[in-house]
């Protein structure tokens, strides 16, 4: 059994992770900010024909989601959990460190308006990707930096990491600790987390970058 008193900055093993459940979390029918339909017929994130999706972890997902929904060309955003072991986890379970999941934001975008490379620039500049299992004062495996790749995104993400890592080193920062892997299953977070900072403009946002610009 997973020891809940363990260091929350240490990844739980698959054997020790919480069992989870078969029932998925219910989410709103439409996006609170732009009112687009959130779900497809299968209950996943809605992706119109010709659009793409991207998945990022960059600390507390409230602020991360806002960074992306503000961009031209972004059709939908939603927050959730990914890259762990527990199926259909809840927020408190993820915060316990006993699921292995990261807090993530899924982004549906129009590649004719904004490219995946453009999204990566926002990702890198919006947080500190050198901090391992934390982001600012938020500590735990659920706050790790991560890029989770669909289709042909893996090589683009890896190249962007190499470029930004050099920019950080040149600026006196540490090496990037961001994990870059194929996109795992995305589980929606609870309804109250979706577009949280639009519903609660004065809400907490611990997101902060390094002030190092992504190289053009």
Where are these regions (language model features)?
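Flexible coil/turn and secondary-structure edge motifs
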Residues: 1-216
